[in-house]
Protein backbone atom coordinates (compact mmCIF):
# COMPACT_ATOMS: atom_id res chain seq x y z
CA UNK A 1 0.00 0.00 0.00
CA UNK A 2 1.45 3.33 -1.03
CA UNK A 3 1.63 5.62 2.00
CA UNK A 4 0.61 8.83 0.26
CA UNK A 5 -1.08 11.40 2.49
CA UNK A 6 -2.82 13.02 -0.48
CA UNK A 7 -4.30 9.61 -1.25
CA UNK A 8 -5.49 9.34 2.37
CA UNK A 9 -7.23 12.71 2.12
CA UNK A 10 -8.88 11.84 -1.20
CA UNK A 11 -9.95 8.43 0.09
CA UNK A 12 -11.51 9.99 3.20
CA UNK A 13 -13.36 12.56 1.08
CA UNK A 14 -14.74 9.74 -1.07
CA UNK A 15 -15.83 7.62 1.88
CA UNK A 16 -17.51 10.55 3.63
CA UNK A 17 -19.34 11.53 0.43
CA UNK A 18 -20.58 7.95 0.03
CA UNK A 19 -21.78 7.42 3.60
CA UNK A 20 -23.22 10.83 4.53
CA UNK A 21 -25.84 13.23 3.20
CA UNK A 22 -25.79 17.01 3.28
CA UNK A 23 -28.75 17.18 5.68
CA UNK A 24 -27.05 15.06 8.34
CA UNK A 25 -25.81 16.67 11.55
CA UNK A 26 -22.13 16.46 12.42
CA UNK A 27 -22.89 13.83 15.08
CA UNK A 28 -24.89 11.77 12.57
CA UNK A 29 -21.94 11.91 10.19
CA UNK A 30 -19.64 10.73 12.99
CA UNK A 31 -21.98 7.78 13.61
CA UNK A 32 -21.85 6.98 9.88
CA UNK A 33 -18.03 7.03 9.99
CA UNK A 34 -18.06 4.73 13.03
CA UNK A 35 -20.40 2.28 11.30
CA UNK A 36 -18.29 2.37 8.15
CA UNK A 37 -15.08 1.47 9.99
CA UNK A 38 -16.73 -1.27 12.05
CA UNK A 39 -18.54 -2.84 9.10
CA UNK A 40 -15.79 -2.52 6.50
CA UNK A 41 -12.65 -3.43 8.43
CA UNK A 42 -11.54 -6.98 9.15
CA UNK A 43 -9.22 -7.72 12.03
CA UNK A 44 -5.66 -8.55 11.06
CA UNK A 45 -2.65 -8.62 13.33
CA UNK A 46 -0.24 -8.81 10.38
CA UNK A 47 0.82 -5.15 10.70
CA UNK A 48 1.77 -3.18 13.80
CA UNK A 49 2.80 0.43 13.26
CA UNK A 50 6.13 1.74 14.44
CA UNK A 51 4.86 4.29 16.96
CA UNK A 52 8.16 6.18 16.78
CA UNK A 53 7.87 6.78 13.03
CA UNK A 54 6.71 10.17 11.72
CA UNK A 55 3.09 10.13 10.55
CA UNK A 56 2.56 6.53 11.70
CA UNK A 57 -1.09 7.38 12.53
CA UNK A 58 -1.77 8.66 9.00
CA UNK A 59 0.06 5.75 7.36
CA UNK A 60 -1.89 3.31 9.52
CA UNK A 61 -5.19 5.00 8.63
CA UNK A 62 -4.35 4.83 4.92
CA UNK A 63 -3.28 1.17 5.09
CA UNK A 64 -6.48 0.21 6.92
CA UNK A 65 -8.86 2.20 4.73
CA UNK A 66 -7.14 1.03 1.53
CA UNK A 67 -7.00 -2.67 2.43
CA UNK A 68 -10.01 -3.02 4.75
CA UNK A 69 -7.74 -4.76 7.28
CA UNK A 70 -6.25 -3.65 10.55
CA UNK A 71 -5.71 -4.26 14.23
CA UNK A 72 -6.78 -1.89 17.00
CA UNK A 73 -4.36 0.77 15.71
CA UNK A 74 -5.83 0.45 12.24
CA UNK A 75 -9.43 0.71 13.43
CA UNK A 76 -8.59 3.72 15.62
CA UNK A 77 -6.57 5.56 12.97
CA UNK A 78 -9.14 4.92 10.23
CA UNK A 79 -11.95 6.22 12.45
CA UNK A 80 -9.84 9.24 13.45
CA UNK A 81 -9.08 10.02 9.79
CA UNK A 82 -12.77 9.98 8.86
CA UNK A 83 -13.70 11.99 11.96
CA UNK A 84 -11.07 14.56 11.00
CA UNK A 85 -12.52 14.77 7.50
CA UNK A 86 -15.94 15.77 8.86
CA UNK A 87 -14.48 18.45 11.11
CA UNK A 88 -13.60 16.80 14.42
CA UNK A 89 -10.20 17.03 16.11
CA UNK A 90 -9.52 13.42 17.15
CA UNK A 91 -6.70 12.01 19.23
CA UNK A 92 -5.41 8.48 18.73
CA UNK A 93 -4.67 6.81 22.06
CA UNK A 94 -1.83 4.33 22.46
CA UNK A 95 -2.38 2.51 25.69
CA UNK A 96 -2.80 -0.79 27.45
CA UNK A 97 -5.87 -2.67 28.62
CA UNK A 98 -6.39 -5.94 30.51
CA UNK A 99 -5.34 -8.84 28.29
CA UNK A 100 -2.76 -11.51 27.67
CA UNK A 101 -1.82 -11.07 23.99
CA UNK A 102 1.51 -9.38 24.77
CA UNK A 103 2.41 -11.86 27.49
CA UNK A 104 3.23 -9.06 29.94
CA UNK A 105 3.43 -10.06 33.57
CA UNK A 106 1.12 -7.26 34.69
CA UNK A 107 -1.86 -8.66 32.76
CA UNK A 108 -2.11 -5.72 30.33
CA UNK A 109 -1.73 -5.67 26.55
CA UNK A 110 -1.29 -2.95 23.92
CA UNK A 111 -4.42 -1.30 22.58
CA UNK A 112 -5.49 1.81 20.67
CA UNK A 113 -8.69 3.84 20.64
CA UNK A 114 -9.80 7.41 19.92
CA UNK A 115 -10.71 10.43 22.05
CA UNK A 116 -12.76 13.26 20.54
CA UNK A 117 -13.70 16.25 22.71
CA UNK A 118 -12.81 14.23 25.81
CA UNK A 119 -15.07 11.31 24.85
CA UNK A 120 -13.82 7.77 24.17
CA UNK A 121 -14.46 5.67 21.04
CA UNK A 122 -13.21 2.09 20.59
CA UNK A 123 -14.10 0.82 17.12
CA UNK A 124 -12.02 -2.38 17.32
CA UNK A 125 -13.46 -3.31 20.72
CA UNK A 126 -16.94 -2.83 19.25
CA UNK A 127 -16.21 -4.73 16.03
CA UNK A 128 -14.62 -7.68 17.81
CA UNK A 129 -17.23 -7.70 20.59
CA UNK A 130 -14.85 -7.72 23.54
CA UNK A 131 -15.51 -4.12 24.68
CA UNK A 132 -18.75 -2.85 23.20
CA UNK A 133 -20.56 0.42 23.74
CA UNK A 134 -17.50 2.68 23.94
CA UNK A 135 -18.90 5.34 21.62
CA UNK A 136 -18.84 8.90 22.92
CA UNK A 137 -18.28 7.61 26.46
CA UNK A 138 -17.09 9.85 29.27
CA UNK A 139 -14.72 7.11 30.42
CA UNK A 140 -13.11 4.14 28.73
CA UNK A 141 -15.07 1.74 30.91
CA UNK A 142 -12.30 -0.62 31.98
CA UNK A 143 -8.87 -0.38 33.54
CA UNK A 144 -6.45 1.20 31.11
CA UNK A 145 -3.08 2.82 30.93
CA UNK A 146 -2.66 5.65 28.43
CA UNK A 147 0.93 5.73 27.25
CA UNK A 148 0.54 8.49 24.69
CA UNK A 149 -2.02 10.35 22.62
CA UNK A 150 -1.48 11.79 19.16
CA UNK A 151 -3.55 14.58 17.65
CA UNK A 152 -4.51 13.21 14.22
CA UNK A 153 -4.22 16.62 12.54
CA UNK A 154 -1.00 17.96 14.08
CA UNK A 155 0.81 14.87 15.32
CA UNK A 156 1.28 16.56 18.67
CA UNK A 157 0.59 14.73 21.86
CA UNK A 158 2.29 13.44 24.91
What are these model-derived regions, one by one?
Residues 2, 6-9, 21, 58, ...:
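Arginine residue identity/basic-tract feature
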Residues 29-37, 68-83:
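Active-site nucleophilic cysteine motif
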Amino acid sequence: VKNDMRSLKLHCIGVVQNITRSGMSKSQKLQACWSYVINNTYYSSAYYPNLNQNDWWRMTAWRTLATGKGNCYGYACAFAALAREIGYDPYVVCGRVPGTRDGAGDGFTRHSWVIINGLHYDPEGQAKGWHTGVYGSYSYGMDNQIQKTVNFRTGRGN
